Amino acid sequence: MNYSFSRVIKPIHSFLSILSGIIFSVIILSSCGKGMNKLLKNPDPAYKLRMAEQFFVKKQYTKAQQVYEDIMPYYKASKEFEDIYYKYAYCAYNLGDYMNAENLFKSYLEIFPNSTKAEEVDYMRAYSFYKQSPKPELDQTNTMRAMGMMQTFINTHPGSPRNKEATDIIDVCRAKLESKDYKSAQLYYDLGQFRAAGVAFSA
């Protein structure tokens, strides 16, 4: 009887522990959300900028991104705007939003063409395309774009210390395209389409 009772009690304890964890997480998330809303409603842009910088340093990129986006209109004509935009672009990159990051890096170069960070940002734009390169079985448009942009970077910045990595990435992308071509040819062969396979293998 005691054994049966313990078998019933243990799952209940386990369920209550999980439920407590969920409730605690909801409370924490709710309080964080309220804190962000309060910060975004704060009328002091300088305070918001300080908080955004703290979030960025702590790698809390979602929060930093929200605050940077909110204060951009206040700082658009100021000396701080370049650094804000730079970190805003990196927020997108660090959050894995590589498509948005590429667009932001591109915009940064258009807005600040003479920036001391222009070479770095130019590379990161190309690298963002590389990060969007999928496995060989899928469409390789971004792989080819990454190759082209890395080559353009090398041509534009002939003395850059990043050129070695750019060259390595081009080689990786080229190998991926070759792998895709081989797998496509192998698929034709496996399907018995030997003429198409022959053309693909010899391409």
Residue ranges and their predicted role:
Residues 5, 28-203:
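Acidic, polar-rich low-complexity tracts and alpha-helical solenoid repeat scaffolds
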